[in-house]
């Protein structure tokens, strides 16, 4: 009898081992450099600055603070921003832009206004030229949004003239009078923000938005033919909305006019369900594929000359749910979200998704840069890097070149039915892989990015090279911590990038154990 019991006990243990991702019996990643997805655009490593809370005032701009330079910019913030290797920064909004009039924020006399999007007073001490000084100091590029809400198409045209025309017309000369003899040469301009949202000042239906956007685009391009234009795609995924219909209309009507369509997503974990939360980036990827299908359909009849097809710009994305009450969305300290490890893993998955969809996702902007749902957090005496800073920095500094179509075999799980965020529809995700993977190659240098979604188990994985051989040491960077709820704070960097010992690799395969609840970046060569 005891013998039989022991037999059954060992059989049970073996069955658990055989299916457990912690022991990784079937975890495989295959890298084939012939299976390419598209060129990775550096603009997926963008960010966003809006006049909201302490993002601008008390964030990037803090005149009189001992930590600020002669122009009022926080030196510690600029150094942290440089570490993110930001490709471009979107400005000035966001909801803010739909009641923003750029002339209020240039020249020696600034106009103080009621700021209606986020319920505060806007002094306009910081405007176009201050922002351009900031991006030049940080070493990045600007991306401006024009006011398609309360603004006019003429106002949009005049802003392009002010920024991009060297001399001659009134607004170019006005810029010179303001002390800036050379044009700023701003390449990227979006035609409004979230215009399908009922919360947007000057909200329009799709047909009326397209009429206004088309005429604004006409005037803006006549002023500077070299600019790139981004249309406002849907941001309204509430149960009674039809975001795909909005996107279909915008792409159909503006298919000959714009270069990108902008999409937004914010996710959260209000129900404290780790596995549901870690599946939310799959929704972004599914929406990407639906929108790509709409683009492909309408590009068949487009007249674009030698311009490429419309691309997707995820120009707002982040985790945002704690600071989303009416009280926490208004005033000086609005949207001050404090992030933990599980949030950082979701950000890494978003970035994996952008890389996997490199053929169509050519821009992405984390919202926002400082204090407001941001990777950088300040007070008057210092700053710290939030958990979400580290995966973004790793991707921006290491992942470039050509995206590869990676084969992944590992255990999976199913989610419950859940809301991915406030104002979102419900989803159920099936067969969610515990390993979320992307890979890129540039000049024979391979980068493999892996999130282990498993909360408790490390996953032992065989990594195979289908063409060529892995060669030389692999550098390994890991973002992890003692607990999925671990956070950073002033003087407490509990979650950060850890450089692990190099892995000596030679041949067609190697094995790596991905720790539980971790993001790992491996970087080596293929010969």
Where are the predicted features?
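Bacterial N-terminal signal peptides
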Residues: 8-19
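Positively charged n-region of N-terminal signal peptides that target proteins for export
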Residues: 1-6
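Active-site His/acidic residue clusters
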Residues: 264-280
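Non-catalytic accessory regions flanking glycosidase/transglycosidase catalytic cores in CAZymes
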Residues: 23-246, 252-260, 284-323, 329-527
């Amino acid at each position: 009898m005891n013998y039989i019991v022991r037999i059954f006990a060992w059989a049970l243990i073996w069955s658990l081992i055989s299916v457990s991702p912690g022991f990784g019996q079937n975890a495989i990643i295959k890298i084939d450099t012939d299976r390419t997805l598209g060129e990775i655009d550096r603009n997926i490593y963008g960010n966003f600055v809006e006049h909201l809370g302490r993002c601008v005032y008390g964030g990037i701009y803090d005149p009189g603070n001992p930590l600020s330079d002669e122009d009022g910019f926080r030196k510690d913030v600029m150094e942290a921003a440089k570490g993110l290797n930001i490709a471009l920064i979107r400005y000035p909004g966001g909801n803010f832009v739909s009641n923003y009039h750029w002339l209020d924020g240039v020249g020696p006399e600034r106009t103080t206004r009621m700021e209606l999007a986020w319920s505060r007073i806007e002094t306009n001490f910081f405007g176009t030229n201050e922002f351009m000084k900031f991006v030049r100091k940080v070493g990045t590029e600007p991306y401006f949004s024009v006011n398609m809400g309360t603004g006019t198409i003429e106002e949009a045209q005049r802003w392009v003239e002010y920024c991009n025309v060297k001399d001659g017309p009134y607004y170019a000369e006005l810029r010179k009078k303001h002390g800036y003899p050379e044009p700023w040469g701003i390449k990227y301009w979006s035609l409004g923000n979230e215009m399908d949202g009922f919360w947007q000042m000057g909200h329009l239906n799709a047909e009326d938005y397209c009429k206004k956007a088309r005429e604004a685009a006409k005037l803006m391009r006549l002023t500077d033919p070299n600019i790139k234009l981004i249309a406002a795609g849907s941001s309204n995924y509430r149960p009674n909305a039809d975001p795909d219909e909005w996107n279909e209309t915008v792409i159909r009507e503006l298919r000959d006019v714009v270069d990108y369509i902008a999409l937004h997503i914010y996710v959260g974990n209000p129900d404290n369900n780790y596995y549901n939360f870690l599946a939310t980036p799959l929704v972004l990827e599914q929406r990407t594929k639906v929108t790509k299908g709409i683009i492909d359909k309408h590009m068949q009849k487009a007249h674009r000359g030698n311009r490429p097809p419309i691309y997707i710009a995820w120009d707002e994305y982040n985790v945002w749910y704690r600071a989303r009450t009416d009280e926490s969305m208004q005033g000086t300290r609005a949207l001050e979200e404090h992030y933990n490890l599980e949030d950082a893993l979701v950000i890494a998955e978003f970035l994996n998704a952008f890389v996997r969809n490199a053929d169509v996702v050519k821009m992405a902007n984390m919202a926002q840069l400082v204090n407001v749902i941001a990777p950088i957090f300040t007070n008057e005496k210092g700053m710290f890097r939030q958990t979400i800073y580290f995966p973004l920095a790793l991707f921006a500094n290491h992942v470039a070149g050509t995206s590869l179509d990676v084969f992944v075999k590992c255990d999976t799980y199913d989610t419950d039915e859940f809301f991915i965020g406030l104002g979102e529809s419900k989803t159920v995700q099936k067969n969610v892989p515990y390993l979320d993977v992307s890979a890129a190659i540039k000049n024979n240098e391979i980068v493999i990015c892996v999130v282990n979604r498993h909360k408790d188990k490390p996953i032992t994985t065989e990594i195979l090279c289908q063409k060529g051989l892995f060669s030389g040491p692999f550098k390994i960077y890991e973002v992890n911590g003692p607990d999925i709820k671990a956070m950073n704070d002033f003087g407490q960097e509990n979650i950060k990038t850890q450089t692990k010992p190099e892995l000596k690799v030679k041949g067609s395969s190697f094995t790596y154990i991905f720790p539980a609840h971790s993001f790992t970046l491996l970087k080596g060569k293929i010969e």
